[in-house]
Structures are given as C-alpha cells and as structure tokens.
Amino acid sequence: MIEIGETIIKFPPLKEGILIKRYKRFLADIELDDGEVVTAHCANTGPMKGVLWPGRRVRLKYSPSPKRKLDWSWEQAEVPSHNENKKCWVGINTSLPNKLIKHLIEANCLERQFGQISSIKPEVVYGLERKSRIDLLLYPSIQNEDSRKIFVEVKNTTWCEDSLALFPDTVTTRGQKHLKELMSVYPDSRAVLIPCISRSDIELFAPGEIADPEYGRLFREALTKGVEVIPCAFGFFIDHITWEGIRPFQKSRENKQF
C-alpha cells in the first residue's frame, strides 16, 4: 500500500518554462527556460479557472513521435497556494486522473472503500441508452461481503476557492449526464464519483454550482440516490506524483462536510 505523501507515479523530469498563451483550446505557446518558444498540446480544453495564467511557470513533457503532431505536452501549471503564501503545482493533463485512480486501487489504497478488487476494466459501455462509457468498472473479489460491481466515474479537479476544490468550472452537460448514469446503476451496482483533485493544497471538495447550477442540483440528488463520493488528492512534482489522501466533501459551497 502507498502511504500518504509517497510517490504513486514516477517519470523523467519535465521541462519548465513560461506560459505565453493558450489558443484554439488544444494549443499553448510556452517559452522554455533556455529561451526557445515551443507549441505544446493542451489536453484540458475547458476554461481552466484559476490555473490558466499567462506569464506563470509551467511544466512540459517532451515526447517526439511520428504519430504526434506536436512533440510537447503541457502537464503542470504553477499557481499561488493557500498554504502559507507558497506556490503549488497543478496537474492539467486530463488523461492522467483515470490512471492515478487505477494505480490507487491496484495498490490497495482504497481497500477500505472498495474492499478487495479482482479486476478493473476501463471505458466500459453502460448507461440508460448504452451510449456512455464508465471510466473504471471494478469487479470485487469473492471474499467481499458486497459482491456488486462498482461503477467509478473520475473527474479531473483543478479549480478552487481558498482550500475548497470545485468541479466543474464551467457548464458541463456531459458531466450532468454522467451523474444521471451513475444514479441509474444503483442499487444493483455501486455507483462512485471520484473527484481527482490534481493539487495538494486542498482540504475540501464541493460541486462547482456557481459555474453549473444544474450540476450542483444533480450532485445533491445523486447523494440521495446511492451515489458515493470519494475525493482523492494528489501532489504534482517535476518527476513524480504523490498520493495525498482522501478529502471530505460538502453538498454545496456552504453546507456541512461529509
């Protein structure tokens, strides 16, 4: 089992630079520390509230390939932290959260929440119209008292107000649909929403209803219809990512925590 603060993923050191601008949703111009200006792929196509700051430091991965249009990928962004006026690095690659949560489960870090898991299948078709894909479908071990399959939806969470993480940071009809789909699998299966908090300076999670009021309403409805919420926090560094533990959550920005 990986302990709090320990490394969950290692990788070659990222390059650092200054963000010049993001444009056309998928592209970002960045000046590297040696003065070279490169164009990087930006996997996060949302507004990136509180994270998209031209002039601030960012980290990139260099991975040239004939199959890629761009050699660089924007991975992390430095933002002001709420802990003692320090800085915090935020993970902005939206393809990482599913991998991080899968690593957590395989390392038995969520055994208390899920019990023993015999297998994990990603991107399984499910839902009311069989047109959605669940991020992770967990199959419990035969030793588990609860033999129901576990449907896990993962949401990359980078926006915050003080030490409160919020998702979403814009209106998301897709996210609303995912909550409805999770509600539809309960009680025959377990339904779990995991906000993957891609920064370490967070104490609580709440729905970002100031950006999407309907999502906030559906979030609270989902809680009454069996959907479990397990916010998981991670720390981002130049050559590794750490497991920072489970955070409590609130039904809204003002409500009591769980």
Swiss-Prot record:
Record CDD domains: SfsA-like_bacterial
InterPro entries: SfsA, SfsA_C, SfsA_N
Database matches in Gene3D superfamilies: 2.40.50.580, 3.40.1350.60
One Pfam family it belongs to: SfsA
Gene Ontology molecular functions: DNA binding
Domain of life: Bacteria
UniProt family annotation: Belongs to the SfsA family.
Protein name: Sugar fermentation stimulation protein homolog
Native source organism of the sequence: Prochlorococcus marinus (strain NATL2A)
